[in-house]
Amino acid sequence: MSIFDERHHSGSGVVAITIDEHDGTRPDIDVVPSFDYVRYDSSDQTRQHRGSKVFPKTGSPIVNYPQQQLDRGTAKNGRTNGRYKRFARALKSAENQLVADGTISDLPSYFMECLIWNVQDEILTGGSDLSAGFKSVLVWLWNGLKEENYVRTDWEEPNGLKYLFHPGAKWTPGDARELVLATWQYLDY
């Protein structure tokens, strides 16, 4: 089975609730209960970004901007002929296998999407096939995440409103480096 078509069941987590598939119903789905949230970027409250706020079982509330993420992700996926989403899923599939093998610790699915979001479109569309393209993506990520090259403000979430690596984030640049290296080795590149 290839990392480009694997699907994994993860179960309910800290934020999402999994609704299991039953005979005659759709496949398992994850549901996230949330509340409306508005971020104001001006003192007169004229510049705003609408999002959602979720309250996990443990820890601090989480603010997301799903519409901005959807709009920007859809645009990037179109610009890259579907490779943005495909490579995000491939990285998550590799991460799932690496976790199952005990090679790395489990990371949130959104983190894989965030990493691929930061890869330039021309890198995502390069390569003669998906494997060569994914290899180029891993090289780009590795080079950008090296301690001597890493600049925190160069990395953002797909919504464009939050830095990827910030105090309180569920992941670090070290987690990303470990994931990229382990994926490279797993795929025997």
PLM feature spans:
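Catalytic cores of NTP-dependent nucleotidyl/adenyl transfer enzymes across multiple folds
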Residues: 2-147, 184-188
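Terminal (often C-terminal) interaction modules
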Residues: 148-189
